A protein has these predicted regions:
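Eukaryotic alpha-helical solenoid repeat scaffolds
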Residues: 1-145, 153-164, 174-180, 189-190, ...
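Extended alpha-helical domain cores of large, multidomain eukaryotic proteins
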Residues: 177-239
């Protein structure tokens, strides 16, 4: 699939520039991923690497933005819940004020989904939150308030924080979606070479396939005459 590296890079840059639109960009990726799973897989791999870098550098603003994107990809079922649960375990393993703040923000975004798809693991995460709250852990009062507000939000079944806004629930059938399962600690290749233009030696054949696929996705009818014209054009170009 041509341009998938560029598309992923553009989506990640747009999300970083405007995290408030994370759910909108995730909805776009969900639709694209349902037709081209390799794009969703590539984006998710790059996102995992970005999360690792932000965590290792203790870059809270970057981490807050990136985990928000991941949360909405989990909500859209582009990503499985494994990465989300591993992320929370990593953030809360040795809690600090910053990691607790990021964890709370993440759960607010995708808590409704995690509660639905993995209730037992989600209960364990909240046991960890309560343990941190009761032990104090020398956390700032603000962080303790964040945890308490999260517990209250859970009791209300995440009222005001739906997994997917009705306007962004675009896929007609959940079975259309392809969910990617990977670990936060997997060895990952971001395939940065895909961001660079390379000549396609079979451009004409691939362009014809692309046109047919585009018509199918957009619901355009392809007549036999159009197919014959495409074949004739290919033969003329090759000749």
């Amino acid at each position: 699939i041509r341009g998938r590296g560029l598309l992923c890079r553009a989506c990640m840059k747009s999300q970083m520039a405007s995290p408030v639109f994370s759910d909108v960009i995730a909805a776009l990726i969900a639709v694209v991923n349902s037709r081209f799973p390799s794009i969703g897989d590539l984006l998710l791999r790059r996102l995992v690497l970005q999360i690792r870098r932000a965590y290792d550098r203790n870059d809270k603003p970057l981490l807050l933005a990136v985990v928000k994107f991941l949360a909405h990809l989990v909500n859209q079922r582009v990503s499985g819940e494994t990465i989300a649960l591993e992320l929370l375990q990593m953030l809360l393993g040795e809690p600090t004020g910053d990691t607790v703040e990021v964890a709370v923000a993440f759960v607010k975004e995708c808590g409704a989904t995690l509660h639905e798809v993995s209730p037992r693991a989600f209960n364990v995460i909240f046991d960890i939150f309560r343990g941190i709250l009761h032990e104090g852990r020398d956390l700032e009062y603000r962080c303790q308030c964040l945890i308490e507000s999260l517990v209250t939000l859970r009791r209300s079944n995440f009222e005001g924080h739906p997994a997917i806004r009705p306007q962004l629930d675009i896929l007609a059938d959940d079975s259309e979606q392809v969910t990617h399962e990977m670990s936060l600690f997997d060895e990952i290749d971001p395939e940065t070479s895909l961001d660079v233009f390379k000549p396609d030696p079979e451009f004409l054949q691939n362009e014809s396939k692309y046109e047919q696929l585009k018509r199918k996705i957009l619901g355009e009818e392809v007549t036999n005459e159009e197919e014959e014209e495409d074949e004739e054009e290919e033969e003329e170009e090759e000749g």
